[in-house]
Swiss-Prot record:
Binding positions (Mg(2+) 1): E86, N534
Gene3D superfamilies assigned: PurM-like C-terminal domain, PurM-like, N-terminal domain
GO molecular function: ATP binding; magnesium ion binding; phosphoribosylformylglycinamidine synthase activity
PANTHER family xref list: PHOSPHORIBOSYLFORMYLGLYCINAMIDINE SYNTHASE SUBUNIT PURL (PTHR43555:SF1)
Pathway of action: Purine metabolism; IMP biosynthesis via de novo pathway; 5-amino-1-(5-phospho-D-ribosyl)imidazole from N(2)-formyl-N(1)-(5-phospho-D-ribosyl)glycinamide: step 1/2
Main location: cytoplasm
Entry protein name: Phosphoribosylformylglycinamidine synthase subunit PurL
Subunit: Monomer. Part of the FGAM synthase complex composed of 1 PurL, 1 PurQ and 2 PurS subunits.
């Protein structure tokens, strides 16, 4: 095998030597392509697995943790929630509409392949600078429109509600946006299916759309960094057909009720290669596949193309012997291809044939269960010492008034209502949505089968992760859990999408290692295990890595009514729970007012964090709260302002602070609550041991906090309209 071909497949010298040892010979081109895909960062987690192994993954309510298509938790009365988050960053930067659309399609398949009907779509998005008229600004606005359009197209056509998410902006994402897709489904606990292929002689059946040449090398592309040349890689981005996926989902859900199959796997990254190797690998089996029997969309396709294509809307099934025709009948009813292309063996090898000729023979375990694990060097980034020594705004650096600061921060795209985005999503289809986009806090659905309210919240502060990757990642867990708890639900488990830069950079690997330590510590302390997730590395363009972004989704349940996260009526007494400590490192104030990222972060007090959750959950059970919201980006002032805008209810608030600017501080573990019964609330609050302070009351036509006063109609006009104007290029 010539060096040019080996390098083109992103195989290192040491990896090629390992391939020779495994095979005892030179690989052919097809085998090299298989090794390249299965050992890619995207499929093998070779740089990250060392750190992921320490995550807490078990709890009495966890049915399935990491290692399957998605995680599963018990939500009571014989029902389970199946959920996962994944990235489609690289494809979405190259071709935003199709990249984002197929990201949605891929995560939906991960859910319904477990036997669950998908009920929820959410997304975590990061873009660069959208304000201004530079080439970069215009391109970022184009990416926003394309990504949102792709998400809306696929989710709406599938009939699955998109009910929440988060979207933020920073120049570190100018060359590498992030598109993380989350989905959740509901299934009976005893009707879950897994990705396995066992039982020698059982047939292997290809179902779904035909295979074309789209997406070739996608897994390898997602394991590489960007430069200007990568923008020409549109042919490697898959093209999705949500209507075909809708048919595939319904066909699979019908099939699951019949008892015809052993296991099923989505054909995602690396297509037929990953699905076949993963199914056989989990079961310790072998497999024979006849590639000439694969349904093809294009002429003269080769075994290499068929194994590595990432054409969408396809599944691989291991059926019970004798049930082949029954399986095919179901898919024919839904106008989908279903062809027996092979069978399970006991050989432990993947044997591939092309019109009767063996074209590949590869041991399965070294590719699926025993891929190389790298121990990359780590080094604390030099920039951390520099930013840790900088002056903070609390030291009197800022020269503008609090009103000027408020106006600047409130007009930031990160703060503004994202109705331009969520108005494109159907959030109500399925009639289960009870908290949808635009209403702050966690999203929520009703599970009709058992009456449980299921809450989901996303969070990650990339700036704080840049300042301290360990504390920043832990904060993402805590903050997502806090949002769920502020709805009155009990946080149960997380899924994650760990977005970092180039792992070949030892400073990036240090960030990643620290981030994993933070997640591990937070999940253990808060008793919220990790049940699924994804790692996205090589988020780098021209040598510039993104800010670390370990996006977290927390899922929780409540049997009682959920709390709103905004002002619902006049005359409600409003309290702040938690300590204000003057935390400005990584804050939006620091970015917007002072145009820098400086300082150090305090440790998170997980005991106080959990106490805050428990206080609000208990208060909601006792029906003594009117609303509750986590204090987030922009601090108390901005959080209150957003809560006021939703129903245009003003408020009069006085916050006693050590420094005037502390109304913008972003201290952890704080909440704002509206109290219906002060006597009972004060009893619970005192019992919790947490600090609590009365801020004032909701009501009126003016929003006032300390010296800041603005008409609520004026505030709402900015909040609901400015983001759309920015993305349309109407205002800068």
């Amino acid at each position: 095998m010539d060096q040019k071909t080996i390098k083109a497949h992103k195989i290192s010298d040491s990896e090629y030597k390992k391939i020779l040892e495994i095979l005892g010979r030179e690989p052919n081109l097809l085998e090299l392509g298989i090794f390249s895909s299965m050992w890619s960062e995207h499929c093998s987690y070779k740089s990250s697995k060392k750190y992921l192994n320490g995550f807490p993954t078990k709890a009495p309510w966890v049915i399935q943790g990491p290692g399957e298509n998605a995680g599963v938790i018990d939500i009571g009365d014989g029902m389970a929630a199946v959920f996962k988050m994944e990235s489609h960053n690289h494809p979405s930067y190259i071709e935003p509409f199709q990249g984002a659309a197929t990201g949605v399609g891929g995560i939906l398949r991960d859910i319904f392949t477990m036997g669950a009907r998908v009920e929820v779509n959410m997304n975590s998005l990061r873009f660069g600078d959208v304000i201004g008229d530079s080439k970069v600004n215009r391109y970022q606005r184009y990416l926003v429109k394309g990504v949102v359009g792709g998400i809306a197209h696929y989710g709406n056509c599938m009939g699955i509600p998109t009910i929440g998410g988060e979207t933020t902006f920073d120049s570190s994402f100018n060359g590498n946006i992030l598109v993380n897709a989350f989905a959740l489904g509901i299934v009976k606990s005893d009707e879950i299916f897994y990705g396995k292929a066992e039982g020698a002689g059982n047939p292997v059946i290809y179902v779904g759309s035909k295979t074309g040449r789209d997406g070739l090398g996608g897994a390898v592309m997602a394991s590489d960094s960007f430069n200007e040349e990568n923008k020409s890689l549109r042919p490697t981005v898959q093209v999705g057909d949500p209507f075909a996926e809708k048919l595939l989902m319904e066909a699979c859900l019908e099939l699951f009720k019949k008892g015809y199959i052993i296991g099923i796997q989505d054909m995602g990254a690396a297509g037929l290669t990953s699905s076949s190797f993963e199914m056989a690998g989990r079961s310790g089996s072998g497999m024979i596949m006849h590639l000439d029997k694969v349904p093809m969309r294009e002429n003269e396709m080769t075994p290499y193309e068929l194994m590595l294509s990432e054409s969408q809307e396809r599944m691989l099934i291991c059926a019970k012997k004798g049930c082949e025709e029954k399986v095919k009948e179901i898919f024919a009813k839904w106008d989908l291809d279903a062809e027996v292309i092979g069978e399970v063996t006991n050989s432990g090898n993947m044997e591939l044939f092309w019109y009767g000729k063996k074209v590949a023979d590869v041991p399965i375990a070294p590719l699926s269960e025993a891929a190389p694990i790298l121990d990359r060097p780590v080094k604390k980034p030099a920039y951390l010492d520099k930013i840790a020594s900088g002056n903070l705004c609390g030291c009197g650096v800022s020269k503008i008034s609090n009103k000027e600061a408020f106006d600047k921060i409130f007009a930031e795209p990160e703060i503004l209502n994202k109705n331009f985005i969520y108005d494109q999503y159907d959030a109500n289809i399925g009639t289960n949505t009870i908290k949808k986009p635009g209403f702050l806090g966690a999203a929520a659905i009703r599970v009709k089968e058992n009456g449980v309210n299921l809450c989901m919240a996303m969070d990650c502060n990339s700036r704080m992760n840049y300042i301290n990757p360990r504390i920043g990642a832990a904060l993402a867990v805590a903050a997502s859990g806090r949002k769920v708890a502020m709805s009155g639900a009990v946080p149960l488990a997380i899924t994650d999408c760990l977005n970092y830069g180039n792992p070949q950079n030892e400073e990036v690997m240090w960030q990643f290692a620290q981030g994993c330590e933070g997640i591990k510590a937070a999940c253990k302390a808060l008793n919220t295990p990790v049940v699924s997730g994804n790692v996205s590395l090589y988020n780098e363009t021209d040598g510039v890595s993104i800010q670390p972004t370990p996006a977290i989704v927390m899922v929780g349940t409540a049997k009682n009514a959920l709390l709103p996260s905004h002002f619902t009526k006049n005359g409600v007494n409003v309290y702040l729970i938690g300590d204000t400590k003057g935390v400005f490192a990584g804050s939006l104030y620091m970015k917007v007012v002072e145009n820098r990222i400086t300082g150090t972060l305090p440790e998170i007090d997980f005991i106080k964090e959990r106490a805050l959750w428990d206080l609000v959950i208990e208060a909601n059970k006792c029906e003594i709260l009117e609303f509750a919201n986590s204090v987030g980006v922009g601090g108390v002032a901005i959080t209150l302002a957003k809560m006021a805008c939703i129903e245009q209810i003003g408020g009069n608030f006085d916050m006693i602070v050590d420094d005037d600017r502390d109304i913008f501080d972003e201290s952890f573990s704080r909440a704002i609550v509206g109290v219906k019964n002060e006597t009972e609330f004060l009893k619970l609050a005192k019992k919790s041991g947490l600090k609590f302070t009365k801020l004032g009351a909701s009501g009126g036509e003016t929003f006032k906090i300390n010296e800041i006063s603005v008409k609520i109609k004026q505030l709402a006009e900015i909040y609901f309209n400015k983001f759309s104007q920015i993305i349309k290029g109407e205002t800068f």
